[in-house]
Swiss-Prot record:
DNA binds at R291, R310, R312, R315. One of its GO terms (biological process) is DNA repair. Residues 182-252 are annotated as: Small ATPAse domain (RuvB-S). This is Holliday junction branch migration complex subunit RuvB. Homohexamer. Forms an RuvA(8)-RuvB(12)-Holliday junction (HJ) complex. HJ DNA is sandwiched between 2 RuvA tetramers; dsDNA enters through RuvA and exits via RuvB. An RuvB hexamer assembles on each DNA strand where it exits the tetramer. Each RuvB hexamer is contacted by two RuvA subunits (via domain III) on 2 adjacent RuvB subunits; this complex drives branch migration. In the full resolvosome a probable DNA-RuvA(4)-RuvB(12)-RuvC(2) complex forms which resolves the HJ. The RuvA-RuvB-RuvC complex processes Holliday junction (HJ) DNA during genetic recombination and DNA repair, while the RuvA-RuvB complex plays an important role in the rescue of blocked DNA replication forks via replication fork reversal (RFR). RuvA specifically binds to HJ cruciform DNA, conferring on it an open structure. The RuvB hexamer acts as an ATP-dependent pump, pulling dsDNA into and through the RuvAB complex. RuvB forms 2 homohexamers on either side of HJ DNA bound by 1 or 2 RuvA tetramers; 4 subunits per hexamer contact DNA at a time. SUPFAM superfamilies: P-loop containing nucleoside triphosphate hydrolases, Winged helix' DNA-binding domain. Has 3 domains, the large (RuvB-L) and small ATPase (RuvB-S) domains and the C-terminal head (RuvB-H) domain. The head domain binds DNA, while the ATPase domains jointly bind ATP, ADP or are empty depending on the state of the subunit in the translocation cycle. During a single DNA translocation step the structure of each domain remains the same, but their relative positions change.
Length: 335
């Protein structure tokens, strides 16, 4: 069953996000620290008539990395060519993409951490000095061909910055950490989406929905669609706080934005492991989820909300989690 609070795209959400996508930094809601930096760097590059330094955007799924890449290209007034790490299977794929770039273009590589190493190594000289050397032919007839490239800006997006090699990471002159959104910013995003799709929503309802959306615009917009459905069938179409609460409760999204999987993780840690510490691998097996899924999809929000802590000996449930789930808290828990 598809998880309503999944950070990744579901169904036709890609086309929906393109409809909602802001075009320029002034329209982009949230991520003020990243925006303020980019505004300066982009304007400086334009005044010097140079390509922008390469940009690395990292953070959890659904926080606007792809949107930011398109905004950067629009601000620069250049074309954006988009691909992804898994799609570039061999060196020839990357060479073809690079050879098709025009001066000043933006090349956006999503999930850049998933590129094969042989492909990644070609990027080094392309990023640093705008050229690539490739081997043509095989055996005794093989020869090296030197290709000059036009100046371009590479924007890499990743949910796992730690998996990037040091040589690749060092070639990004600009890094932007896309953080979870504040409730006020998410509220504005919810109201903007409602306006675009001609929904009627009370400000208090938008705030309540934003508060329970895990700091993630993608999740907020997804929940808004389901709340709209509920309001249409169970009410008069107006999205109120009461309607929002009832709809989210029906969807198993609690007051802290946790769903049944989040609660299962916390309850397992409390009931089976006495609050921890417990290793990530052991916990993943117990709840029948992949280790990477737990680490990338569930754990970041639980840590950000203060429900679990990482320690040297494993994950530990906090007093806040005990209180939220209604368990008595024992202060003798080891950390």
């Amino acid at each position: 069953m598809t998880r309503i609070l999944d950070n990744d795209l579901i169904g036709d959400e890609g086309s929906v996000e393109r409809t909602l996508r802001p075009q320029y930094l002034r329209e982009y809601i949230g991520q003020d620290r990243v925006k303020d930096q980019l505004m300066i760097f982009i304007e400086a590059a334009k005044r010097r008539e140079e390509s922008l330094d390469h940009v690395l955007l990292f953070g959890s799924p659904g926080l606007g990395k792809t949107t930011m890449a398109f905004v950067i290209a629009n601000e620069l007034g250049v074309h954006l060519k988009q691909t992804s790490g898994p799609a570039i299977e061999k060196a020839g794929d990357l060479v073809a993409i690079l050879n098709d770039l025009e001066p000043g273009d933006v090349l956006f590589i999503d999930e850049i951490h998933r590129m094969p190493m042989a492909v990644e190594e070609i990027l080094y000289s392309a990023m640093e000095d705008f050229y690539i050397d490739i081997m043509i032919g095989a055996g005794d007839t093989s020869r090296s061909v030197h290709l000059e490239l036009p100046p371009f800006t590479l924007i890499g997006a990743t949910t796992r910055a730690g998996m990037l090699s040091n040589p690749l990471r060092a070639r990004f002159g600009i890094t932007g950490h896309m953080e979870y959104y504040q409730t006020a910013d998410l509220t504005e995003i919810v109201e903007r989406t409602a306006d675009i799709f001609d929904m009627t929503i009370k400000h208090e309802a938008a705030y309540e929905l934003a508060r329970r959306s895990r700091g993630t615009p993608r999740i907020a917009n997804r929940l808004l669609k389901r709340v709209r459905d509920y309001a249409q069938i169970m009410g008069d179409g107006m999205i109120t706080t009461q309607i929002t609460d009832k709809a989210l409760t029906m969807l198993d999204v609690d007051q802290e934005g946790l769903d049944y999987v989040d609660q299962k993780i916390l309850r397992t840690m409390i009931e089976v492991y006495q609050g921890g510490p417990v290793g990530l691998g052991t916990l993943s097996v117990n709840i029948a989820e992949e280790r990477d899924t737990v680490e990338d999809m569930y754990e970041p929000y639980l840590i950000q909300k203060g429900f679990i802590m990482r320690t040297r000996t494993g994950r530990v449930v906090t007093e806040k989690a005990y209180q939220h789930l209604g368990y008595p808290y024992e202060k003798t828990i080891k950390t």
